[in-house]
Amino acid sequence: MNSTGKIRTATLAIGGAALGLLSLTSPAAAATSDAAATQLLTKYNCQACHTVDKKVVGPSYKEVAAKYAGDSTAPAKLEQKVKNGGSGVWGQIPMPPNSVPDADLKTLVEWILALK
């Protein structure tokens, strides 16, 4: 095999290995994120008013994600909304303020905004 063939073979091997690693790590990372979010949603009783895909008292998480899609200020807005509560955005029923630590709040908001 000449040097061009060796380079091509090495490139294909490296590319294949990288794709293999991505296919193994991406689903696991998503599952961990879902598991972490579910644990936090339960811990802070978010499911009393919200679900992933249908309105209960407040909007579904997917509705929130769709409303704020493409809005670079959405994470900060949603973090403040959860902390301080508010009304008028999704109807007349107000969202009460919540005592969620910043790190957990960031995890939840990132998870919600990533929903499709």
Please report, for each region that a protein language model flagged, where it lies by residue.
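Protein kinase-like catalytic domain
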Residues: 50, 83, 113-116
